[in-house]
Amino acid sequence: KMRTNKIIYIFIISLIMVACEPVDTQTDSNYDPELKLKELGIELTTPSSPVANYVNSVRSGNLLFISGKGPLKNDGNYIKGKVGSDLTIEQGYEAARITAVNLISTIKASVGDLKKVKRVLKVTGMVNAAPNFTDHPKVVNGCSDLIVEVFGDKGKHTRAAVGMGSLPSNIAVEIDMILEVMD
């Protein structure tokens, strides 16, 4: 009877251990961020070079940190100005969406295949805002909406959307992100 109880105990512990194993959410055969970009008509670009003593991305273990990027358009110009005085919320939203494309381009350059993105963890959106402007989240939604469109549930992230008195070169937004990636 004692041996039977030990076997049952070991069996129950084994079941608990199996139940607590992390589930690999990457097995979804429909997960293809690059195909989604193509469907949306979005072409990735070569990431802009850092303008100071930093790098575009750093990987530590399975974490990928992407440096702040701005709304650099395909014509080589940035969307500039303060949201709430020079730019509307809609223009700020578009600036954040373009910035998301630049962030995704940097992810691709860093890991090679966007299917390696296991989860977008954190997005920090800084809005170059007029002093009385308070709709920062509506602007940063331009980035968040595209990230979720491209990466699906894996793109749902934590976020900060904050207003700044100024940003480098008067760009409309600067956004950085942290992701979990696979080998």
Identify the residue ranges that each predicted region occupies.
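Extended, hydrophobic interaction surfaces within ordered domains
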Residues: 4, 18-21
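Bacterial N-terminal signal peptides that target proteins for export
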Residues: 2-8
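Bacterial N-terminal signal peptides
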Residues: 9-18
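Short, polar/acidic, helix-capping and beta-turn segments at strand->helix junctions
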Residues: 21-183
